[in-house]
Amino acid sequence: MDIPLCQSEHKPQLLLNDPAAIPLYHTAPERFAGALAPNAELCDAWSEELVPLPVGLALACPPEPDAEHCERPITMHYIEQCKEVFRPLLHDDAAFYYLHGAPTFPALRAAVLALGDLCGRTVIAELHVEDDEGHLPDGTDVRAAIGVLQRIGVTTVLISAHDPESLTQALEIAAPYARLSLGVCMHADWLSQTTLYNTEVIVPDITEAFVAALHGNQVSCKTLPRDHDDFICAPDGKHAHFIAPTIDISDEIECGPHLDEDLIEAEDDSGAFKLLLETEEDVVTLEESRYMISRPLCLCAESADLLEQGLRVVPGLALYDGTWEQEDAVISYFETKYGMIRL
């Protein structure tokens, strides 16, 4: 499936997710971008019945491990846990995978990395916003979440919410910064109360109602221009930061027992923190102190393996400024896999 997901002039389009809606697809195929099967059996059946519609599989993210009884780094353990859960569910005929139900944003990012380790299929991810200011339940800014996901292989983000106002606000906040396809999961009775900014895909609750609304031009859609292309989006994992390539970066900060204090001390002196990884224990310390990181983060390590471990546990996008120079092929891989930003 190409990016963006919707290639039709009939936008937004629907993801078929109900067997009862299959006759609607045959009647109005232009209204559908794809189909979302709940299991491999239906994925097989729909792949044959709905040709040429791409059919994907839904994958529920597992619960996060208990921090008190889990080996460190916890993120590494969770990535392996996701692989164990996802591996038997993967299917040759699935055109894409739809990740949903992640308990936190760092968990969703880890699930995306796990799926990327297992296969190279298109990934769609769901983000649930908790308020009308575009925050996820763990407080993550929706712009930060999208900024990370669009650089680690996710091609479409579907936003859900408790109410139409929160959904509208989240779309309006995210649309200027999104460089991937935006979609929504929504109820039909929200149609008159929701404005769909830059929305290409809808996962409906009642497919028939949405087909009728789209046919009758009863869906309020608006386009917002992309903004801030002159700046780099460098989320710390929770907050969105927009930086210039010439951002002031701190001196190297060791990930030792006083990392929290060192981060507080460096907070007013630079635009980004540069953390040095020298041992695997430093990676554990980095993970434990990530909630103290309120600036864009630059990682450096003499060992490419250590640098990769750091990239796996950091929920945001790490900067690379050339300290402890790595091979170009290695940095290119880190850019693709983890969204590392080469300055």
Q: Where are the model-predicted features located?
A:
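Domain-level signal for soluble alpha/beta catalytic cores
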Residues: 1-343
